[in-house]
Design a protein with these regions (language model features):
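A residue-level marker of the well-folded mature domains of exported/periplasmic proteins
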Residues: 1-169
């Protein structure tokens, strides 16, 4: 029976256990999103050192987490952004909310949250709003920019239209 792996890669000794893998280049996704962020910062005449990012990572070791984390880490180094924290949200809304509550309490300067999937972004937005802050693209007005990945849930696109999610990779 042919086995086709979708989305996440698997690490096995015997590659004959599956026929093929179909999925994204997750590091390239991270590169594309951070390139969008870089262009946004330039367009708004912002100083790159004024960008303070928290990465709500997916489940540690998942291929999407590894690639998306690498994409952000490399861009932060190259662009002089302040990468405040990398914490796992396990690709869930509940954990994304819990982690964001902690990040907001710890890092007052936090102005960009890079969520490695939509569920984490939804949780982060809930936490931002519960803290009396606003998720949005106007960093000069104190809003917190939310970046997400996948865009597979209807709410993700609605949040883009409402400017609660600034970019989906």
């Amino acid at each position: 029976i042919p086995v086709i792996i979708l989305d996440r890669q698997v690490d096995v000794q015997d590659e004959s256990l599956f026929t093929c893998w179909v999925g994204s280049d997750f590091e390239l996704e991270g590169k594309m999103v951070t390139e969008w962020l870089r262009e946004y910062i330039i367009a708004k005449n912002m100083n790159p050192s004024d960008i303070h990012i928290a990465n709500i990572q997916g489940t540690i070791g998942a291929s999407a987490q590894i690639g998306r984390t690498k994409g952000l880490a490399k861009a932060a180094r190259e662009n002089g952004w302040d990468l405040l924290a990398e914490v796992t949200g396990d690709f869930t809304q509940t954990k994304g909310r819990e982690v964001m509550i902690s990040l907001l309490a710890t890092y007052k300067e936090l102005n960009v949250v890079y969520c490695e999937n939509d569920n984490e972004a939804f949780g982060a937005i809930e936490a931002i709003e519960a803290a009396g802050r606003k998720a949005g693209s106007n960093l000069a007005a104190g809003e917190i920019m939310v970046i997400s990945f996948d865009g597979v849930k209807k709410d993700a696109m609605q949040y883009v239209f409402e400017d609660k999610i600034s970019c989906i990779g």
